[in-house]
């Protein structure tokens, strides 16, 4: 679970978007909100002050401290049956910008397979919670054509790096060959 220290460090380093996994209760949603926002909405401390560094934020009209509450994005992930049961109340917590229908983990934690009618009903619960709270609804990029989904997870950074490396080095790939020189060369 993401804690106050992790959120504080991310924000102090300049993060503008905080994504918190496995939010199951209103209390957890309020805690995440409190750690993300300065008073009066939250209880974020000034911490080490890294985010207030003039080199990083000196050109922000009004300064970082006075403007960040209006610019930070807080996304809470609904991944379990408990989170699903509390989705409407979680989405209604002031300061929550969006809820994320965590497609894979909802399937993992509930036992329903993506595409099954019961699975789709779960996604509709998250959908309705976001729409009724007038916040954004997030999901995987594959859902970009679903109604009302407006922010997306494009995939893992590992997969993106692997694709990039494959494109860059693809012509060099020859996994069947044996090295002829060097420490991995086959010895006669």
Task: List where the protein language model places each region.
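Alpha-helix-loop-beta-strand connector modules within alpha/beta enzyme cores
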Residues: 1, 34-44, 66-70, 115-138
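C-terminal active-site rim and adjoining tail of enzyme catalytic domains
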Residues: 131, 138-170
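C-terminal helical cap(s) of enzyme catalytic domains, especially alpha/beta-barrels
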Residues: 26-42, 112, 157-182
């Amino acid at each position: 679970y993401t804690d106050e220290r992790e959120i504080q460090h991310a924000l102090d380093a300049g993060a503008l978007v905080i994504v918190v996994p496995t939010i199951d209760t209103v209390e957890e949603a309020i805690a995440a909100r409190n750690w993300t926002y300065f008073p009066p909405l939250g209880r974020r401390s000034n911490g080490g002050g890294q985010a207030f560094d003039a080199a990083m934020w000196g050109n922000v009209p009004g300064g970082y401290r006075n403007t960040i509450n209006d610019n930070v994005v807080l996304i809470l992930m609904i991944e379990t049956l408990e989170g699903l049961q509390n989705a409407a109340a979680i989405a209604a917590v002031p300061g929550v910008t969006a809820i994320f229908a965590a497609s894979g983990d909802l399937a993992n934690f509930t036992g329903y397979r993506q595409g099954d009618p019961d699975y789709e009903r779960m996604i509709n619960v998250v959908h309705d919670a976001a729409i009724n709270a007038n916040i954004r609804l997030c999901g995987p990029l594959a859902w970009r054509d679903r109604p009302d989904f407006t922010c997306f997870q494009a995939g893992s950074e590992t997969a993106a790096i692997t694709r990039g490396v494959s494109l860059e080095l693809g012509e060099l790939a020859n996994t069947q060959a044996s090295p002829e020189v060097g420490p991995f060369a086959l010895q006669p």
